[in-house]
Regions:
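Residues that define the transmembrane beta-barrel architecture of outer-membrane proteins
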Residues: 41, 68-74, 116-123, 149, ...
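Transmembrane beta-strands of outer-membrane beta-barrel proteins
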Residues: 43-45, 89-93, 123, 138, ...
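Residues on the lipid-exposed face of transmembrane beta-strands in outer-membrane beta-barrel proteins
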Residues: 47-49, 76-80, 123-129, 155, ...
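Transmembrane beta-strands of outer-membrane beta-barrel pores
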Residues: 49-55, 80, 95-101, 129, ...
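Surface-exposed strand-loop-strand hairpins of Gram-negative outer-membrane beta-barrel proteins
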Residues: 52-73, 110-111, 166-171
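Repeated loop/turn-to-beta-strand initiation elements of outer-membrane beta-barrel proteins
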Residues: 55-56, 86-89, 133, 192-195, ...
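Outer-membrane pore/translocation modules
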Residues: 99-216
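Outer membrane beta-barrel transmembrane domains
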Residues: 210-306
Length: 306
């Protein structure tokens, strides 16, 4: 049986998964440090806020054009690290709430709606298959001092728990199941520099109650790359970029001309304080946009770890 060592007060041991717990916008998200491990038995609670403005809706594949939105998100997340077959594994639960106004064109007609309510809940399981055996705080400090190449896999499941009205185009929830399997690699370039890469794919269930018809969506291939600078224990910053393609939808027998092919660029900073607390901030913008994705995002989060 693995030994569960007490978690030390040093926040550097507890912050490495913060960025993972703060994003709410499916394939368009930027998530640095998604596969960096924490010691066995670590718990993290995060309260996150996001502000998005521009061509964005809760479900980016909706058949809307000329979208202009102003949406605020709150998200509560809990995460625990544990040992699975002698390797580091992490389970994360997230529940978002959003409120905002969205306006766009649907078949040449302007549609606008104020929305508020709970979004779709998420569960994510990640597992490190190389470079991150289950470890106590002492082992984690050794990994920080001499980083190794880390390879991890993950599965994210998004459940149709959000508020959804069958007679509305614009909703908070998506009324369908979604899953995203992914694989990620962390390469240490120097002791304080890390290069991270992830490739994954979103797969979507059907929405059988889309204005009286069934709405289907093709998978979306997504990639992310992050350059991370560790400034001091627990204090780090990153430059983030992604690219995603696919996701064409069909409603009934009609295929939509809404293939997504876009990329985003942003930056993230995490600053610890008073031992077990931290703040996180990030900004991102559309770099190349086709069929949505041209929006600005500000994210602020508070973290408590034990």
């Amino acid at each position: 049986m693995p030994e569960y060592s007490p978690i030390p007060n040093n926040i550097s041991v507890l912050l490495s998964m913060l960025a993972l717990m703060c994003s709410t916008v499916s394939a368009q998200e930027l998530v640095p440090r998604a596969y960096w491990p924490t010691p066995n038995g670590t718990n993290i609670l995060v309260l996150g806020y996001q502000k998005t403005t521009g061509d964005i809706v809760t479900d980016p594949s909706l058949p809307l054009t000329g979208v202009d939105s102003d949406i605020d998100y709150l998200q509560l997340s809990y995460q625990r690290t544990f040992s699975l077959a002698g390797r580091t594994a992490t389970m994360q639960l997230s529940l978002p709430y959003s409120r905002g106004y969205t306006e766009g064109l649907l078949e040449g007609e302007i549609r606008g709606r104020h929305t508020s309510g709970l979004g779709d809940a998420r569960v994510r399981l990640s597992y490190n298959i190389k470079g991150a055996p289950s470890m106590d705080a002492k082992g984690f400090q050794a990994l920080r001092a001499d980083p190794k190449t880390i390879v991890g896999v993950s599965l994210l499941v998004q459940a149709p728990t959000g508020d959804y009205e069958v007679d509305k185009v614009i909703n908070v929830g998506t009324n369908r199941w979604s899953i995203k399997p992914a694989i990620g690699v962390i390469w240490p370039m120097r002791p304080t520099w890390l290069l991270e890469f992830e490739v994954g794919a979103w797969f979507f269930g059907d929405n059988g109650d889309f204005l009286g018809e069934t709405r289907e969506q093709d998978p979306i291939l997504s990639t992310e790359i992050h350059l991370v600078k560790r400034i001091r224990p627990g204090f780090w910053a990153s430059l983030d970029a992604n690219f995603y393609m696919g996701g064409r939808t069909s409603v009934g027998d009609s295929e939509q001309a809404n293939l997504q092919r876009s990329s985003r660029f942003g930056a993230t900073v995490v600053l610890p304080f008073k031992g077990r607390h931290a703040f996180r901030g990030s900004l991102s913008t559309g770099l190349v946009t086709k069929t949505g994705g041209d929006f600005e995002m500000l994210s602020l989060s508070y973290l408590y770890a034990w």
